[in-house]
Design a protein with these regions (language model features):
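Extracellular beta-strand/beta-solenoid scaffold signature
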Residues: 44-47, 78-93, 114-129, 151-187, ...
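Feature marks extracellular polysaccharide-active and adherence modules
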Residues: 33, 65-67, 95, 103, ...
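Hydrophobic or amphipathic alpha-helical targeting/insertion segments
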Residues: 100-101, 127-137
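Surface-exposed acidic, glycine-flexible loop patches that form ligand/cofactor-binding
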Residues: 17-25, 52-55, 129, 183
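Right-handed parallel beta-helix/beta-spiral solenoid domain characteristic of secreted/periplasmic
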Residues: 38-119, 145-159, 231-240
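Acidic helix-start/capping segments at beta-turn-to-alpha-helix junctions
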Residues: 31-39
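Residue-level recognition of the N-termini of beta-strands and the immediately preceding loop/turn
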Residues: 26-30, 60-62, 133-136, 160-162, ...
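Acidic Gly/Asp/Thr-rich repetitive segments characteristic of extracellular carbohydrate-active
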Residues: 1-31, 44-46
């Protein structure tokens, strides 16, 4: 196990040390204090780095959860970007990391005007064309954004605010689609279960690479809702701004062997 501290003064401080990890010998769990609230830094909390991503595996997993009791809330900062910006605003993002579980957190965007509103609650991005995000689980989270953000997107970034947004791009060039260099560069085998998502333009979006046959460079095996009603997601009050731009509870594009069920 990496030499992390037993306790940290903030989630941000814990992530700084976590992203500096170079080796792991077993699973790591970060348990956030019940009732705690922390504001995200500009562009959001980030999980993923070149060293951490190389250390994570099916046995060296990362779980971020909360202690029993009152909700643990991550709040949005003040955004500056629109959905068609290269570097969108969000609360929490996974960047190329694998085997990460986000369990039971509450994410809230209290901004009420654009462009201060967030483009995503939880974003899942690639670190590079060779390092996609794989085998991650987002479950039991409550995500509330602002559906007034219905502005036009660009490239793989869709219109407006998205509760959970998985994108074929890196977070600092989010509107530029990547061509995966191999299967490791896809966003594959990720699961989204038992989340409550509200007041967004889209609830969940998974947007992959338009692969050609035999589709080895396409996203594969992503799962929205699991196999029973207990693991379904609740998505309400989506679509907004009163504009003609599209909105949906779930939007899926360029995916293979995906599951969508509630």
């Amino acid at each position: 196990t990496p030499a992390l501290q037993a306790t940290y003064p903030s989630f941000s401080a814990a992530l700084t040390d976590l992203n500096a990890v170079t080796a792991m010998t077993g699973p790591v769990t970060l348990t956030l204090a019940a009732g705690a609230t922390e504001e995200a830094p500009a562009k959001g909390f980030t999980i993923g780095s070149a060293t951490l991503n190389a250390a994570l595996s099916s046995t060296n997993t990362l779980t971020i959860t909360k202690a029993a009791g009152a909700a643990t809330t991550l709040t949005a900062g003040i955004g500056t970007a629109a959905p068609n910006a290269a570097s969108p605003d969000g609360i929490l993002k996974i960047v190329g990391a694998d085997y990460v579980t986000i369990d039971g957190l509450t994410l809230v965007d209290g901004n009420t005007t654009n462009p201060e509103t967030m483009e995503f609650g939880i974003g899942i991005f690639k670190a590079s064309d060779a390092d996609g995000a794989q085998h991650n689980m987002i479950r039991n989270c409550t995500i509330t954004l602002n559906r007034i953000n219905n502005a036009s997107g660009s490239g793989p970034m869709v219109e407006g605010s998205v509760g959970i947004n998985m994108v074929n791009s890196i977070p600092t060039a989010a509107t530029t689609s990547l061509t995966p260099s191999g299967a490791s560069g896809t966003n594959s085998n990720n699961s989204f279960h038992s989340n409550v998502i509200e007041n967004c333009n889209y609830g969940i979006v998974i947007n992959g690479y338009a692969a050609s046959s035999p589709f080895t460079l396409g996203d594969t095996g992503n799962d929205i809702g699991g196999g029973s009603p207990a693991t379904g997601n609740t998505i309400t009050n989506f679509g907004g701004g009163g504009t003609s731009n599209p909105a949906a509870g779930i939007r899926v594009n360029n995916q293979w062997s995906a599951n969508i069920s509630n």
